[in-house]
Curated annotation (Swiss-Prot):
Root EC class: hydrolase
Database matches in PANTHER family: EXODEOXYRIBONUCLEASE 7 SMALL SUBUNIT (PTHR34137:SF1)
Pfam family, one: Exonuc_VII_S
EC number: 3.1.11.6
GO cellular component: cytosol; exodeoxyribonuclease VII complex
A GO biological process held by the record: DNA catabolic process
Gene: xseB
Protein keywords: Cytoplasm, Exonuclease, Hydrolase, Nuclease
Protein's job: Bidirectionally degrades single-stranded DNA into large acid-insoluble oligonucleotides, which are then degraded further into small acid-soluble oligonucleotides.
Gene3D superfamilies (UniProt xref): Exonuclease VII, small subunit
Species whose genome carries this gene: Pseudomonas aeruginosa (strain ATCC 15692 / DSM 22644 / CIP 104116 / JCM 14847 / LMG 12228 / 1C / PRS 101 / PAO1)
Protein name as catalogued: Exodeoxyribonuclease 7 small subunit
Length: 80
């Protein structure tokens, strides 16, 4: 089965969770563990990149003086 070059965030996270479970099981050989660890690092980086891009894209639209203006997303949830 051909794999897409990159997975979406949810697929990457699910695959990462599966890898962690396999590693924690203790049933993998050293080579299999190293391969799973390497793949886990790659997936972690992909997830971090996806989250970073999503955070940059998320903006709150505020209505001011009848016009829409964009305000950066406040991750803390502090609204004045």
């Amino acid at each position: 089965m051909a794999r897409k070059k990159t997975l979406d965030f949810e697929q990457s996270l699910t695959e990462l969770q599966t890898l962690v479970e396999r590693l924690e099981s203790g049933e993998l050989s050293l080579e299999e563990s190293l391969g799973a660890f390497e793949q886990g690092i790659r997936l972690t980086r992909e997830c971090q990149t996806s989250l970073s891009q999503a955070e940059q894209k998320v903006q709150i639209l505020l209505e001011r003086d009848g016009e829409l203006s964009e305000a950066p997303f406040d991750a803390e949830g502090d609204e004045a």
